Amino acid sequence: MTLEADDAMSKGDDAATGGYDFTRADQGMPHHPRKQRGAGGAEAEPHPAILRGLKLFGEAASGGAAAQTLFSRHNLHVSYAWFKSGFPLPLHSHDKDCYYLIIAGSTSVGSEVLGKGDGVFIPAGAPYTVTPGEDGVEFLEMRTSPDYDTHYRGRTDSYWDRIAATLRGSKERWAEEEQPYGLIPIAP
C-alpha cells in the first residue's frame, strides 16, 4: 500500500472534501478594503482634506501598485500586493490587526527596512505607511477578518498634493518596472 492510499483510508469519508478551500494564483479577486474612512472613528465623517486626497490618490495611483485577494473567509483574509519603487502609500490605520510577509524586494516601515522573508505585525489602530525600496516590494497581507476599516490620517491638502505629485512623477519609471519575483503575475 502506498503512503497516499494509507492516508486516504485514515481520513475515512472526509477524504473527498476534507473541508479544504484551495486557491489558485489565476483566480484571485481585486483587493479593496470594504470600508475606507478618514481618521476619527467608524461613524465620523472623513476630514475634507482626506476626501480630496483620496480623490487625487485614486486619479493618480494607477500603475504604481496592484493587489489581489487570494483567500477570504470570516476568520482569515489573505491578499497579495505589489508596490513599485517609492510608491507613496498614505499614512493610515486599520481596525483589525495585520501581518505583512515580504516575498521579494524591500520596504521600509518606520525606520526598519524589511526584505525577503521578513515580516511585520501591525496592531489595530496603529498608524503606518510603507515605502518600497528601489526594486519595489511584493508581500502577503494577512488579517483575521475580511471586514476591516481603513482610516486615512493625512489631514492637510499639502500632504495629499505631495502624494499625488509623487504618483504623477513616477508613472514613466513605473511603466518599465517588473515585479521583483512575480509570485502572482498581475498588472497594476
Briefly describe each language-model feature range.
Residues 1-75, 157-188:
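A short, N-terminal "cap"/entry segment at the start of jelly-roll beta-barrel domains
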Residues 67, 79, 87-90:
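Short, charged beta-strand/loop "edge" motif centered at a coil->beta-strand transition
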Residues 74, 108-110, 133:
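Short strand-coil-strand connectors
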Residues 78-82, 99, 119-121, 141:
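Conserved hydrophobic/aromatic beta-strand scaffold that supports enzyme active sites
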Residues 82-85, 93-108, 113:
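Short, conserved beta-strand element in jelly-roll/cupin
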Residues 113-116, 124-155:
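Ligand-binding loop in jelly-roll beta-barrel domains
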